[in-house]
């Protein structure tokens, strides 16, 4: 029997947090190996396990996977979170790319110089309210189903709910005008594994902050 997936990153949300969300929603227990020094990263590179010399990296099923989207897709396909046919997968991928576009602004913000963070926050609030949230609310309204695609839980639903949490941490009440998104958030938050993940003391990381920025400098620069 294969062991638990092992996640290689540093002690932050960053690009690994969405992977944590997907594994959690799929009911998969995982281990983490957190880099703390530049030497930890260099050892992974020297060992030849980082194809493009970068993390996140996930050890799973005998593979050492890098590139976030590839990791998303493997987890989703393995755990039946990727639609029933090629058309559903295309929609799931399309929605996921939109989610990732906005989440990218959020996950990079804490690592910007402090004087640039306020402008980035304003951009996040604007794009969430006027571009991304209305688009996903419209999708849910168009078919009246519980999930974005095929009336079945997919990676897009999970990553969207992570995004909703991320935006609301920065802008409380951001989903107030989007009742279907709120309902989706509640639905997925009540999945037993996700409910546990959202509790204090779980493997969910706190929001990235100045401490994470300093750790990243030590490891990556």
Curated annotation (Swiss-Prot):
An annotated GO BP: glutathione metabolic process
EC primary class: transferase
Keywords: Cytoplasm, Transferase
Source organism phylogeny: Eukaryota, Metazoa, Chordata, Craniata, Vertebrata
Protein name per the record: Glutathione S-transferase Yc
Catalytic activity as recorded in UniProt: RX + glutathione = an S-substituted glutathione + a halide anion + H(+)
Subcellular location: Cytoplasm
PANTHER family per UniProt: GLUTATHIONE S-TRANSFERASE, GLUTATHIONE S-TRANSFERASE A1
Alphabetized GO MF terms: glutathione transferase activity
């Amino acid at each position: 029997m294969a062991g638990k997936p092992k996640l290689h990153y540093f002690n932050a949300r960053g690009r690994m947090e969405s992977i944590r969300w997907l594994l959690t929603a799929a009911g998969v227990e995982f281990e983490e190996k957190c880099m703390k020094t530049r030497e930890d990263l260099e050892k992974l590179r020297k060992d030849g396990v980082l194809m493009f010399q970068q993390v996140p990296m996930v050890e799973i099923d005998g593979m050492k996977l890098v590139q976030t989207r590839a990791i998303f897709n493997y987890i989703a396909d393995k755990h039946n979170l990727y639609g029933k046919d090629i058309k559903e997968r295309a929609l799931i991928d399309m929605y996921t790319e939109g989610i990732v576009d906005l989440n990218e602004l959020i996950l990079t913000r804490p690592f910007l110089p402090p004087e640039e963070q306020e402008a980035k926050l304003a951009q996040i609030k604007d794009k969430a309210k006027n571009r991304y949230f209305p688009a996903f609310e419209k999708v849910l309204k168009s078919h009246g189903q519980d999930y974005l695609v095929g009336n079945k839980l997919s990676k897009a639903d999970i990553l969207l709910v992570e995004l909703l949490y991320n935006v609301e941490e920065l802008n409380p009440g951001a989903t107030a005008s989007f009742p279907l998104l709120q309902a989706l958030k509640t639905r997925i938050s009540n999945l037993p594994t996700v409910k546990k993940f959202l509790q204090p003391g779980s493997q969910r990381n706190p929001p990235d902050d100045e401490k994470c920025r300093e750790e990243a400098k030590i490891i990556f620069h």
